[in-house]
Every structure is written in structure tokens, then in C-alpha cells.
């Protein structure tokens, strides 16, 4: 577990981050592709982007108290690892992501859905208001687990029920945007080159705006033109 990241997972244990800080929360899940194809410059740029996210959120007094981050890496065969459990942005330390193995994307999405419901139960138990959770899935390939379609259906159903907002981000020339689109009614988008820093800067600004919105209201997000590839 990375220093500065919360390792608490049992909802029966009092969570000091919620009793000490009773601010409304915006839960944000980052699902990070750590497969072998991300090795080299892609994973280096992604790690630099995570550091940008950490630094920018900590500069914002309100967002640093309200945005909660969960970082999950998927790689190996069916290896899904929580790199950073639910942590307020003020205490978030960007994890160092390494690259190896395959792309068990479905397994990561299933874990994210479970942990989101657990965290919402914590919020309710502590009287904490929260905005609709955000889930960001970043990949340069396609799912390699056999039952990924079931996870995609679960994600789409949760989104349609208003339980989350899902963003699919594809990087590199080998990403399968068609399969990524199965996880959400929102169309996935393509990263320009390796502009992970620009992506995470946009994410920090977007979550900052959303964290200040009243519960249940819509938020105008900044344009993603700095990092999103526009189809010809």
C-alpha cells in the first residue's frame, strides 16, 4: 500500500477520514491498464500524469477535502491490485504503476463496482453527502478475461441506474474502442499520443468543479481539447 493511501476496507470499522472530515464527497475511481504493452514511455507518462493529478488537487482547498480517490491496476493474467484505497485528495500520494502481463479489464471493473457500493455505505453510515461517483478506465488494448462482457453489462446497468458516471479513455493504436464502448452509454474517447499529463490535469479541474456542485446537480466540464484526439 502506498504511503498516504488508505488501507481500510471493513465498513464496520470507524473511518477517521469520514469522522474527522465531514465534507460532501466526490468518489473517483481510476482503473489503470498496467499490461505489458504499456511498458516504457507510456507507463512513464501515465505515472507523471498521476503526479500532476496529486499536485493539482492538493492546490485546491475545497477539492482536496471533497475528492476521494481509489486507484486500481489491472495486469498479469487476472491480477487486479488496489494501488490506493479510498483516500481524500489532501492525503493522496500518486502510486507508481508498473507494466506486465495481460489486460483483465472486466475483473477490475467488477472490483470497482463492489468497492463503490461499500464506500457509499460508509458515507451513509457517517451521514456524509456525496456526488455521483466517477469511474475512469484507461487502457491501450482490449479485455483479455473471458467474462469481461458480464462486467461491461454490470457497469452499463449501474450507469443507467444513476449510480455512477463512466469515462472510457483509449490510448495508443491498438486500443479496441468498440469493446471499451460496451462498458458505458457514453462513447469512449481517444488520447492524443501520450498526453497523460494533460488528461490528468483536465481530470483534476473537472473533479474540482464537480466536488463544489450541490448533490444531484449537473456540472459543466472543461473542454478536453488539450488531450482528446478528434476523429478526422
Q: Where do the protein language model's features map onto the residues?
A:
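Acidic, low-complexity intrinsically disordered regions
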Residues: 1-232
Amino acid at each position: 500500500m502506498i504511503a498516504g493511501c488508505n488501507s481500510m476496507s471493513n465498513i464496520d470499522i470507524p473511518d477517521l477520514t469520514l469522522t474527522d472530515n465531514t465534507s460532501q464527497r466526490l468518489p473517483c475511481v481510476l482503473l489503470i491498464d498496467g499490461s505489458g504493452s504499456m511498458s516504457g514511455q507510456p507507463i512513464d507518462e501515465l505515472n507523471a500524469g498521476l503526479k500532476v493529478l496529486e499536485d493539482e488537487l492538493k492546490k485546491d482547498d475545497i477539492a482536496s477535502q471533497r475528492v476521494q480517490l481509489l486507484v486500481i491496476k489491472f495486469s498479469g493474467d487476472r491480477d487486479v491490485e488496489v494501488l490506493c484505497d479510498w483516500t481524500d485528495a489532501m492525503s493522496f500520494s500518486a502510486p507508481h504503476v508498473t507494466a506486465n502481463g495481460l489486460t483483465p479489464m472486466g475483473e477490475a471493473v467488477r472490483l470497482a463496482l463492489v468497492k463503490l457500493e461499500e464506500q457509499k455505505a460508509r458515507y451513509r453510515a457517517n451521514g456524509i453527502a456525496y456526488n455521483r461517483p466517477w469511474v475512469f478506465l484507461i487502457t491501450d488494448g482490449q479485455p483479455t478475461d473471458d467474462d469481461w462482457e458480464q462486467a461491461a453489462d454490470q457497469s452499463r446497468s449501474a450507469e443507467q441506474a444513476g449510480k455512477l458516471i463512466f469515462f472510457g479513455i483509449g490510448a495508443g493504436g491498438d486500443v479496441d474502442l468498440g469493446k471499451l464502448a460496451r462498458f458505458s452509454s457514453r462513447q469512449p474517447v481517444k488520447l492524443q499520443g501520450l498526453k497523460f499529463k494533460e488528461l490528468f490535469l483536465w481530470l483534476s479541474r473537472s473533479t474540482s468543479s464537480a466536488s463544489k456542485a450541490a448533490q444531484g446537480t449537473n456540472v459543466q466540464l472543461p473542454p478536453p481539447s488539450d488531450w482528446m484526439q478528434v476523429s478526422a
